[in-house]
Amino acid sequence: MSDTSIQQQSQLTSGDFTAAENPFALFAEWFADANESELNDPNAMALATVDPDGLPDVRMVLMKGYDTDGFVFYSHIASQKGRELAANPKAALLFHWKSLRRQVRIRGAVSAVTETEADDYFATRPKQAQIGAWASKQSQPLESRFAFEQAIAKVAARYLVGEVPRPPGWSGWRITPLRFEFWHDRPFRLHDRIEFSRDTPAQPWIKTRLYP
């Protein structure tokens, strides 16, 4: 590693994040930094679930909101992720911000957002994306791209004028954290890691520093 790289990392870690006591506040700080430094989708997160056989699944989704109740994303209820979350409402998230040499891991319980929340968010989506949500049978076999484009055209014709309502099979989920882990790269793999954990959302956080 060059002296320049080491100096850059030293600048990134000039504030001791391991002194933080509130994981949500620390996430907010890091996410604000990511919004300034990441070129593409700082709200992108890996979502891990398991199927009924216990086989893990992971995919990238976009976080559409967060607060102390949890982290929210949206998709089709009948999708692979939707079916897996219905069978086992627990999940893990990973945010990786390469430009900052940071990552945040989150594990917790999953619950559905309210109908009002889903409606309100769906109304903010571009109309073409709303139409796509109606046309797509996410995770189901697709005969051809042409078949999908035909389905899109039919939905577009149906909603040529006026607002597009939210499909009944499209909604969102909230992951309420029971565990956070904040990781920051250091020179020579001597990284900093801290974990916040609790058994239930009503309990206070327990902070632990971890070996890299």
Curated annotation (Swiss-Prot):
Keywords: Flavoprotein, FMN, Oxidoreductase, Pyridoxine biosynthesis. Pathway: Cofactor metabolism; pyridoxal 5'-phosphate salvage; pyridoxal 5'-phosphate from pyridoxamine 5'-phosphate: step 1/1; Cofactor metabolism; pyridoxal 5'-phosphate salvage; pyridoxal 5'-phosphate from pyridoxine 5'-phosphate: step 1/1. GO terms for biological process: pyridoxine biosynthetic process. Coiled coil: none annotated. PANTHER family: PYRIDOXINE-5'-PHOSPHATE OXIDASE, PYRIDOXINE-5-PHOSPHATE OXIDASE. NCBIfam families: pdxH, PRK05679.1. Catalyzes the oxidation of either pyridoxine 5'-phosphate (PNP) or pyridoxamine 5'-phosphate (PMP) into pyridoxal 5'-phosphate (PLP). Belongs to the pyridoxamine 5'-phosphate oxidase family. This is Pyridoxine/pyridoxamine 5'-phosphate oxidase. It comes from Rhodopseudomonas palustris (strain BisB5).
